[in-house]
Amino acid sequence: MKNFLLPLLTVVAGRAKANFLRKTRHTDAVQAQYLRNLLQAYQDTELGRQYRLSEIKTIEQFRDRIPVLPYSSYEPLTERIFQGEPNILTPDPVVYLNLTSGSTGSKKLIPITKRFQNSLKQANLISMGFLADALRARNLKFGKLLLTNSAQMFGRSPGGINYGPASVGVLRMGKFLYEQLFAHPFETLLPVDSLARHYVCLLFALRQPSMRGIIANFPMLLLRTCDYLERYAEQLIQDIEKGTISPIVELESEVRSQLEYQWSADPDRARELQQILQSEGQLTPKSAWPSLSFVATARGGTSDFYFERFPKFFGETPVFGAVYSSAEATFSIYPDVDTDGSILAIETGFFEFVPQDQWEAEHPKTLQATDVKVGEYYRLLTTNYSGFYRYDIGDVVEVVGFYNTAPLIVFRYRRGGMLSATTEKTTEYHVTQVMQALQQEFGLPLEDFCITLSESLVSPHYLVNIELLPGQSLDNPQSFLDSFDQKLRQANTSYAVRRPKNFIPPPRLRILASGSFATLRQRQLERGIPDSQLKFPHISEDRQFLAGLAVEREIKLSQDTADAE
């Protein structure tokens, strides 16, 4: 049955994509119709009555009537939904509550209804249609894929509503669909232990040499999967040969029973993998699955920094962005592989763009999708079936073009994530550009990095904290640091203006001990952040963010005469 369902799914995805493309010729009309439908459906909710949605007839009235509010204004309402009260934000029953990771701020609850979920599912289907066509154009095939996200919910609210990460809700509510796509049983996503879950997902996927894709939320998580594949290659091969699941893998007894029932030995495949391991010295995705056609993960933001390490593991395998989304919304859909620009998802929400000169305004003037300009940066407001109106999650996007009349956008950074020794406002996008260029210039891929400020409250130094990959060394650290300084001046004009006059003192390089960023990630897990949502800021004004990590060396520039802090 599954053999013909996957091609059928691809056909359906292709039709959804074609329909979406037709609508991108009429972006304003599609957006206006979405808003009208939502206002009519939501006018009798508690918030709908408060805002008198039934009286709103135009987009201008909507902007005038509805304020731009942070999550804190919705929190009392989502707490009542958590307790089970109906018709607060949505007229439809809430079937799930997305709990945001809290990796870039406090945690939030986002109500999910079937209507909302269906709109997001449609965006995913459209992205699948784009991917299938992009692969076909490159003589590659779409097919089964590996995903290691947890499918474990966090719990059930007093009102009887399941809650957890957004990805868990997507997987649970779309279980039948995803079972057609996975190269491993759905039950492999159930182990609580992160390593155990990755192990069994890899184990079952390795049985399928013709697997076509690998998916993870962020590039860093794909690299972690590659690390597990390399580290546990011998044990995985042994389990494939013998038809066992190693007792050292920490599985709940019920999950182990379910997986062992579906597992059997494959000595031929084990022999093939052993030969690859012996000839190449390691297992990588590209060697284990020679038919690999794509990897799908987040693009934009800090992704380019991690992409520098992809060729070692994936060769020239195309990288697909799928959809640009958060727990609150799906913002855009990627039309092709190896591209950062994604098409505004005009059927999943009503979107407004806040120009830079309005970012500090209490009631910002906004633009519609067709009014934005290429090369400009905007904050993105969304109104959708979650019951949030003109909601600003803080993402800053750049418009890089248009697809018919719909803008192509790229996520650049989250507003508020800025670094300032004075008033220069260095963003995560600035430093990611710089660190990516440094990796290329010095031929030195890094484990990770984070730019912080020194302890001084007056004229603090930029601290360039890096961790080298095992076996790597930085032979000319002062040149590396000087190049960082020069490249950051090029990336951020405000930094460039303040550096020569020493308003911003010279940066300093700190080489952290091996395993430092693994320690940071473990700290996040201990804070309750799901392992599939792991990400951390690459800039931080929190002087304690890297507290407790060992610094192997600190390097200063020659003009830096101040004592090290």
Language model segments and positions:
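Conserved small-residue
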Residues: G105-P111, L146, S157-P158, R212-G213
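Short secondary-structure capping/junction motifs at helix and strand boundaries
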Residues: G48, K108-P111, A132-K144, Q235-D239, ...
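Amphipathic alpha-helical segments in well-structured domains
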Residues: Q117, K121-M128, E428, T432, ...
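Active-site cavity-forming subdomains of large catalytic enzyme subunits
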Residues: L131-L177
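Active-site glycine/GP-rich loop and adjacent strand/helix microenvironment
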Residues: M1-S54, F62, I66, L77-R80, ...
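Long, hydrophobic, well-ordered secondary-structure blocks that form the structural core
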Residues: P111, Q117-A123, V319-F320, A327
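Conserved adenylation A10 loop of the ANL superfamily
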Residues: L97-P111, T225
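Active-site diphosphate/adenylate-binding microenvironment
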Residues: Q33-N37, A41-L97, L109, R115, ...
